[in-house]
């Protein structure tokens, strides 16, 4: 019996395992934290390596690009080798690469180590999710995803604090050294908690699909990074266009070949299709907010970085504060009403951000951002749960790889879109007259963009994901067009 078959049987015959979900969530936290924690250490790293701070950005781009490019092959690798082996190996690679990062003597070595670290991270997140999903009955999926969502909400809160504290009181090397005991503990726990399973050696790798998909995703990530860092230059737009072309070619290939890298028929499941499109827009818009807010507070209001950072933390206070209530809300009202409410309420808070200025009372700003963060958390949790509600066990590897890739792209696209809106609304002479004008336009634009997610949620059936939201057992149909 293959691993996917044995785990499907396990999910149907036993309750979910909170310790396994907590282990996977902990590895997610390491990966998410390392994606952003380096920002606060850039000046120190630049000083040690005798380079300008802008040069150090390549280490972040290399990491994010490797993660995004590695995710598409994760489903095939887990099926071929076995999810337990891949997950444990990913933790080992990530931990070893963290040590190499700390031992780096120059920027080239650090960048290479970050690529290796990204390769480990690319396998940890989707394969870890797959391990949990395969061992979780439908009626417990909402509880399981509640564990898996918190790293994405908590890591942005702690990353600046952890990075700043380690760099200030120790050195930037400890940003990576701290992963070693955590990684070793996670590796030992994985050996004990992750169930064994035989891989399917008959699964051949779709090399054409792999090359087209990874090249397309890589070009998109690089293009979004370039478009954000150098909006006046054409390289970002060219890279994004090339990435979209490669992704389109990959879709055509995956639909025609008999042995695709991942199955696109998962989009025949209505809940997965709707939450992939609406969820992408939702994650894109909420990713733009932490980018726009500190810029508005510093450039528009004239605040110092610390003042701005404390105020932005209000968003993440709302994220964490509402988290215990998200599961009861979904159980009480169902997915569709919760998604419609979260996206509409988020759009309203974005529009209200456009009304802020330097004279707005700070407690009022803080309260608005706490509310925005709470709505962000509700929608984030709901999308993470419903996307797998009607996916059958055999489709999980493909659905998981596609979803993880879209999440990674949405985060980068959100920052790029925020920067694009700022540029569009920065008319010559406007900034001098009203330094907040461009930010007002940008926040109104992302509010309108969020309404597209609302429209997508309205198209869902009233009982969409009911087996998950109501905690009912039962196997879903393979497709629900």
Tell me what each language-model feature is.
Residues 48, 52, 106, 171, ...:
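Short loop-to-helix capping motifs
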Residues 71-208:
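Helix-loop-helix hairpins in multi-pass membrane proteins, especially solute transporters
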Residues 99-100, 165, 218, 222, ...:
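Alpha-helical transmembrane segments of multipass membrane proteins
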Residues 168-278, 303, 446-447:
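Hydrophobic transmembrane-helix bundles of small-molecule transporters
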